[in-house]
Each structure stands twice: as structure tokens, then as C-alpha cells.
Design a protein with these regions (language model features):
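Divalent-cation-assisted or electrostatically stabilized phosphate/pyrophosphate-binding catalytic cores
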Residues: 133-155, 196-211, 234-238, 260-286, ...
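Amphipathic alpha-helical segments within well-ordered protein domains
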Residues: 72, 160, 220, 281, ...
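Residue-level signal for inorganic ion chemistry
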Residues: 86, 159, 185, 280, ...
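A non-catalytic, amphipathic alpha-helix used as a structural packing/dimerization or gating element
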Residues: 44-47, 51, 174, 206-213, ...
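Inter-helical turn/loop segments and adjacent helix faces that build the functional surface
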Residues: 93-102, 162-174, 189-206, 220-236, ...
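Conserved N-terminal diphosphate/IPP-binding helix and adjacent helical/loop segment
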Residues: 1-118, 122, 126-141, 177, ...
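Active-site alpha-helical segments that house and flank conserved acidic catalytic motifs
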Residues: 105-130, 180-181, 212-216, 220-223, ...
Length: 371
């Protein structure tokens, strides 16, 4: 039902939080001081990353000029290139892949997962109506929604082409399965928007589908191309799963506590769009009157549907402030640490050395990153 008075931020008093509900902190295994330097962690695979970058930036000379420009801007905007880096590192765990004919297939895999990731971002921006990403205008800000979707489709096609270049049917099937999983996750997210009584399991299913599945494709696909034993292929799949789950959890934490300028969006952007993430679930679990929080949000959303978006924004702003002041963020970060400890454990059966150390260092980087 409609509410008669605007819902102000103070509707979420911090005194209602249970101050005793703080999790025990599980620290990651200490790493050398340089382990958090991503450039140092990528050093063993730098030549391979350059090859991936060259492949990503290749533009068909016959391509429609505006699409070619958009393609160059999307790929040229860079990013951490974590997905291809994980593929390259995983492929080298058994030693001696660089310089072999099979290494070109690993390069193609790395380009494939990165291009697939980029394509999903383009479509996400259309679905969310986002005009900015990391503070820069999205393709959606310049083109119509239809044109942007078509551009994303082109990227999907390019990713599929790269996958085919591996000439490995198991990897090609993995690419197809991953794409289907991503779409399933996107549909789940759309269905659960503004559903404030959904289960936390919905969140885990969603972030596996939209994020972790791509990391799984990178590490499992690389293990297949490296011809590792099935047990080790399974280990690297699990590594990708645990790494990817933690990566998205930290992303969702940063959405609440990160610097607006660095992230290029206001705090609580996911919640403002009706997407519930792990910090919110912990906030709700720790709140002594969770039902009142849900009632406030549901009423504010009704007001927004009736044209009064200010009520919704005020409600979310108040919740974000209260969430930051409590222990929900640390509880979510603890879950990320647990996933990353599992990821490190997944590497125990693989040869020790530079590549494994880089994978372990990336786990430490993920839990501490601020962007």
C-alpha cells in the first residue's frame, strides 16, 4: 500500500543493529610485500598477455566504421585482464607451454573469455540503463539501445570465433555452456529485482552465473588445453569458481563502501536498481527488525513506481549509511576470504613454482582491492 509520508534516511537507525554480530576474521596466508603488485604477478605471463591484447584489438578492415570505433574504444578501455591472466597462468602450471604450438590455443582462450566478459558488460549497461561505467560514458550513452545490443552481439560473435580458434571441442562446448549460464544468471537477476524477501541462495546462484562461470571457463579451459590430468582440471575449475565468487563479493562490497570517483557511480548503485547483494543480506540478517526494513523499502519502491523517485533514493541513502556503520561489510568480506582460502587450497595438488605463486598472490589482491 502507499505510504503517506516521505521515508527519510533516518528510517534506518544504526541503534537497531546488533553490535555483537561481528564475524571472526580469517586472514589469508601472508604473501611477500610485492605479491599485491598485479604487474609483478603478471610478469611470468607478460608475453602471453601482449599476444592476447593484440588479438583483442584486431579489427576487421571491412567492419562498419561506427562499430569499428566502438569496438576499439571498448577494448582499448583496458581493465585488469584478470580472466586471460588466469588462463595463461593455469596453462603454465604443468610447465613449458610458452613457445609451443598449443600456446596459440591458450591465447585464443584468453581472448575469448575477455571478449565474452566485455560483451556481457555492454548488454548489462543496456539492461540497467547505465550511462557511465568506471566514470566513463558507456556505449549506451552514445547509441540507441537497439544499436548497443547489436554491438554486444558482435562482441559475442567475436568471442565465439576466438573460442573456435582453440580447435578443441571440449573448450568450445565449455564456451557455449558458459554463455548459456551467463544468460541464465541475467534472467535470474531481472526476476529478483526489488524482491526484498528473496533467499541468499539466489544471490550465490546469480554471481556464479554472471561472474564466477567466466573464471571457471578460463582456468578449466586452460587446464584442458594444457592436457592436465582430469583431477587437476577439476581442481582448476574449483579454483576459478572460488576465485570468481570472491571477486564478485568484493565488487559488491565496493559498491557500498568504495570511493564514488574511483568506481564512477554513487554508493549503493546495485540496491538503487533493485539488485540485492551480499552486504545487504548480512545487514538484514543482523538487523533486529528486518521486517521493518523490508516494509520501508517496499513502500518506497511503490512510491518510486508512482513517480516519486526521491522517496526511494532517500530510503536507499539512509540504508547505505547505516550499513556502512555496522558489521555487514566485514561479514561479507569474511565470506570472500573463505572463498579465497578454498581457492588457494585448490592449488595444493598442482606443481609449486612461479605460476602457482602468482595465482596465490592474485587471491590476496582480490580480497584487498579497492577498485
Amino acid at each position: 500500500m502507499l505510504i503517506s509520508q516521505p521515508i527519510m534516511p533516518q528510517s534506518f537507525p544504526s541503534k537497531l543493529m546488533d553490535a555483537t554480530a561481528r564475524p571472526n576474521v580469517v586472514e589469508m596466508t601472508p604473501q611477500p610485500s610485492g605479491a599485491l603488485d598485479v604487474n609483478a604477478l603478471f610478469a611470468p605471463i607478460r608475453p602471453g598477455l601482449r599476444q592476447v591484447e593484440a588479438k583483442l584489438c584486431g579489427v576487421d578492415s571491412a567492419l562498419f566504421a561506427p562499430l569499428a570505433d566502438a569496438f576499439i574504444n571498448l577494448i582499448g578501455s583496458g581493465g585488469k585482464r584478470l580472466r586471460p591472466a588466469l588462463a595463461l597462468l593455469a596453462a603454465e602450471l604443468n610447465g613449458g607451454m610458452q613457445g609451443t604450438p598449443r600456446y596459440s590455443a591458450v591465447i585464443a582462450l584468453g581472448a575469448s573469455v575477455e571478449m565474452l566478459h566485455t560483451a556481457t558488460l555492454v548488454h548489462d549497461d543496456v539492461i540497467d540503463g547505465s550511462l557511465l561505467r568506471r566514470g566513463a560514458p558507456t556505449l549506451n550513452a552514445h547509441w540507441s539501445g537497439v544499436s548497443t545490443v547489436l554491438a554486444g552481439n558482435y562482441l559475442f560473435g567475436t568471442a565465439a570465433r576466438f573460442s573456435a580458434e582453440t580447435q578443441n571441442m571440449r573448450v568450445i562446448e565449455l564456451f557455449s555452456d558458459t554463455l548459456r549460464t551467463i544468460v541464465d544468471g541475467e534472467l535470474r537477476q531481472l526476476k529478483d529485482r526489488y524482491n526484498f524477501v528473496q533467499k541468499k541462495d539466489n544471490y550465490y546462484q546469480r554471481i556464479y552465473a554472471k561472474t564466477a562461470s567466466l573464471f571457471c571457463a578460463a582456468t578449466q579451459g586452460a587446464a584442458v588445453l594444457a592436457r592436465l590430468p582430469e583431477e587437476r582440471i577439476a581442481d582448476l575449475y574449483q579454483f576459478g569458481y572460488n576465485f570468481g565468487m570472491a571477486f564478485q563479493i568484493v565488487d559488491d562490497i565496493l559498491d557500498f563502501v568504495g570511493d564514488d570517483t574511483t568506481l564512477g557511480k554513487p554508493a549503493g548503485s546495485d540496491l538503487r536498481q533493485g539488485t540485492l547483494t551480499l552486504p545487504f543480506f548480512h545487514y538484514l540478517h543482523q538487523h533486529v527488525d528486518a521486517s521493518s526494513v523490508i516494509a520501508i523499502l517496499e513502500a518506497a519502491q511503490i512510491e518510486a513506481d508512482n513517480g516519486d523517485g526521491a522517496v526511494w533514493n532517500e530510503a536507499v541513502t539512509g540504508l547505505v549509511q547505516d550499513l556502512r556503520a555496522g558489521s555487514a561489510v566485514e561479514a561479507a568480506r569474511e565470506e570472500a576470504r573463505i572463498f579465497l582460502r578454498r581457492a588457494v587450497d585448490n592449488l595444493a595438488g598442482l606443481p609449486d613454482g612461479l605460476y602457482r605463486h602468482s595465482l596465490q598472490g592474485l587471491c590476496e589482491f582480490v580480497v584487498r582491492r579497492t577498485y
